[in-house]
Amino acid sequence: MKNKNLILAVVALVIGALSATASRADDPDFLAFSTGWFDFNRKKDQGGELRLEYRLNKKLWEFKPFGTLAVVSNGMTFLGAGVLMDIYLGRRWVVTPSFAPTWWRGKTDDLDLGHGVEFRSQLEFAYRFDDRSRLGLSISHYSNAGLGDSNPGTESLMVNYSIPLGNFSKMFK
């Protein structure tokens, strides 16, 4: 039974990968807007987080560069750039893991992330519309990876809307 399930899983992955080839080929640059809950898991200094990202469609292997700016209602800010990879599950669903070193500022009495450099790792799961815009959920982890004396880290839970830049410019015509 295990072998049968493994074979079915491999077949499903191959079919998904083949059907996603056309989807992968026509993706543009994106402007991504996100809002969500900062420090939702540890609850040391919770707040609302707003994020803006510019996601380029230029690829190095399967990796795409992006820039990010996040502001939190507790006064923290994160500015950085990193890489992401879009993994297509058929025509409509996209899983996007990403990684970005960021410059952090805004220590509060309740939460000190321990160093000015914070690394953000994120996993996003999104639905892709006909116009190629995406609506998704993501979970992010911020950590200084041991660069500071302390490394408390924190997580964010976000709702993301990514709009192709071509669609964005059409809104203002």
How should these model regions be labeled?
Residues 54-58, 85-87, 127, 163-165:
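Residue-level signature of outer-membrane beta-barrel architecture
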Residues 29-39, 62-73, 97-103, 137-143:
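Transmembrane beta-strand segments that form the barrel wall of outer-membrane beta-barrel proteins
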Residues 1-27, 166-173:
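Cleavable N-terminal export/targeting peptides
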Residues 29-31, 59-64, 91-95, 131-137, ...:
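Repeated loop/turn-to-beta-strand initiation elements of outer-membrane beta-barrel proteins
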Residues 50-54, 81-83, 123, 159-161:
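Membrane-embedded beta-strands of outer-membrane beta-barrel proteins
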Residues 48, 152-173:
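Outer-membrane beta-barrel "beta-signal"
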Residues 23-56, 167-171:
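Outer-membrane beta-barrel initiation region
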Residues 38-48, 69-80, 89-91, 110, ...:
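Solvent-exposed loop/turn segments connecting transmembrane beta-strands
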